[in-house]
């Protein structure tokens, strides 16, 4: 600690000192607010709104607003906000992250900033990690907010459009992070303003902010459509992978291995060696999937390479019951941070299909991205952003760097007395499991409840089998049993209860010492007062037993890559001043040790074990683990920051496109925009044949006439104009061409009516924009995947990505203008008389075909508008419309049948 910090206190201490002055002010108001009637207290909401309209700021009314919520909470919920909760509420109002320990009442704390900021009328979004928490928190706080005249909405998957609009129209909306992001993307795919859901993105309060803004940061939200089906290729390539041999190190000048591929476990990437490449190519040629003499790395074989690498990663880097589970014939991803399943999510880049082929389930088609955004960029769209969690301080630097959010550690209401014991290390996993079982046995005998944290479904099941063998009764909470999550967590605080949980499964629900009598009461149908009193008495007895036994004991079966996840596991114990204890059991076979410690350190540690099964505890061990975790955290932070730098490029483009789209949806008349685009497009085309400030000898008039005819359907005798009028120069010629294009367009408009033409313009513009944006996203994906190769040419990949993507974006905008004007200029408008004449002609032709015994296409639904002509005396051209009226070319309709006959 520096001398200045000793004198002035840390930044956190200074912030808390300042906020405590506000707490004193709020506490002084309490007697006056207690004296108010219910109606007078309710009337405060309208009073605050009027004062805000009159020019007062949120900070000016904050003390009174917080005092109002506190008093209303006492009357409606029977809960009074602690002083530390008032501090938390003020921190959340100030665009900060409040670190509040487990059990300190984050749900109640959130009511303070939500009420205050909702007074502005812009809407408040409270963001949770799953549907259960969104519903639970909304129903818990709904009576309080409705008492104060605020409406509450819940936005979760599966709502109808009307229910979703009602949820967003509420003053305070509880929602999951994924649903908010997807609704944003859906709004920007809407074809009318009535289809949109979200209002202005004003204030988001993110619960478990570390989980959403850090753990999920690299997960893009993607809305996709089906791409070309290549399921058979995944199944074929899947057969190749088991024959490939792993090589421990990459080939160098000094070392030439005998394997076919190497793995980078940190980045979860696989690489073929030269030997492996040859082996794969020979197999593909033998299977007829690649011609002889071709290379896997040639541009024409990029799709094959993509399938091979996806299959290799699926087999070597992704484990069943660790990274995913197989459920009802589908691959379901397991969240590496929470241990929860993520139904409906799919890995991209063909990885999900490769895993489906590996596990022998139905291989679904690949998808093409239609719209996407990362959580990092979505939450930065909000005017105000704040968050709360039990563990943010270790990631404070990242929150500040990426989101501009300061982290403030809120003191606990009561001192924390949990006993965090030193880690113990074992030589191998078997010795470690033996020690864990002995620790659990000791706790069970003393009637102390135990929560055992594992890092994967597989490890939780291994430990469960070991406990079964030892005859210890226990519950398992992992991705396979997530439906029973609330029930298992409710029982985890009973005397002698043993619960195995993957990572932070059950996070967001407190483990109450002695069990949860309310959860037991909820199981009873219409419980009597006597039954409730009996449950309370039973709980009090169990609570006393558990308190005497030492509270909840936490066992970590290995260290996670992030200190924050370890702290979250420990944080389940010792809530609100309760007793508790924690200890981590480690082995040299743990993933963290294998991947992030070099062989030298591992050998040194192996030598320290002289007796089989002995445990090692030392300060050096703590330093080694801290060093490994710091490396991993830095590696992941760099990855997230790197992703954001690339995604920021796409984000600027996304913002521009969505702004243009919203402008189109909000305006029924875009004729001015169309006119401006028409001038740009025609001038651009003319420039190619009549360069600006050029001599007449340099003009390519014939080429211009052909181009205008082919692209825009305009037959203009420009050569004749020039012969007839010697005064026609470059500018006047341009004006004449554009004037004719505008005149022809006006004539079409006169035929169909102004409203119909405006509607048509808008439809063409939206459809073209969406199609080109979808293609652009696919191109950006390909660019992103290969841009790192520019580094070999001594170029900065990020700068190259920015330049290339800007060029592609500019080309897309030019293409948008061109395609819109081409479509609008070429469109043919028919009068009612022409339509009737065309229908008569179609019927005559159909009759003539029947006379000639040509079968009419029964599937034909469209009518081809064409002039009446006798086809019986001449041969029909292959590319002419088929006389049957199907709308198809003759060669694709009856022409093909005639050829077959």
Curated annotation (Swiss-Prot):
Q: What is an example of a GO molecular function annotated in this UniProt entry?
A: protein-exporting ATPase activity
Please describe the quaternary structure of this protein: Monomer and homodimer. Part of the essential Sec protein translocation apparatus which comprises SecA, SecYEG and auxiliary proteins SecDF-YajC and YidC. Forms a complex with SecB.
Changing residue 878 to A has the effect of: Binds zinc, unable to bind secB
Its subcellular locations are: Cell inner membrane; Cytoplasm
- Listed Pfam families: P-loop_SecA, SEC-C, SecA_DEAD, SecA_PP_bind, SecA_SW
Start-end of Basic residues biased regions: 888-901
Report the protein name in the record: Protein translocase subunit SecA
Membrane topology, as annotated, equals: Peripheral membrane protein
Task: Give the matching SUPFAM superfamilies.
Answer: Helical scaffold and wing domains of SecA, P-loop containing nucleoside triphosphate hydrolases, Pre-protein crosslinking domain of SecA
List the top taxonomic levels of the source: Bacteria, Pseudomonadati, Pseudomonadota, Gammaproteobacteria, Pasteurellales
Q: Does the keyword Protein transport apply?
A: yes
Q: Where does it sit, as one GO cellular component term?
A: cell envelope Sec protein transport complex
Can you tell me which residues bind ATP?
85, 103-107, 510
Q: Organism, per UniProt? A: Haemophilus influenzae (strain ATCC 51907 / DSM 11121 / KW20 / Rd)
Q: Region Disordered: which residues? A: 848-901
Chief location of this protein within or outside the cell: membrane
Q: What is its EC number?
A: 7.4.2.8
Q: Where is the composition biased (Polar residues)?
A: 849-866
Give the GO terms filed under biological process for this record: intracellular protein transmembrane transport; protein import; protein targeting; protein transport by the Sec complex
Q: What CDD domains does UniProt report for this protein, alphabetically?
A: DEXDc_SecA, SF2_C_secA
Q: What's the top EC group for this one?
A: translocase
Cofactor field:
Zn(2+)
Coiled-coil regions in this chain? none
PROSITE patterns in the cross-refs: SECA (PS01312), SECA_MOTOR_DEAD (PS51196)
Q: Which UniProt keywords apply?
A: ATP-binding, Cell inner membrane, Cell membrane, Cytoplasm, Membrane, Metal-binding, Nucleotide-binding, Protein transport, Translocase, Translocation, Transport, Zinc
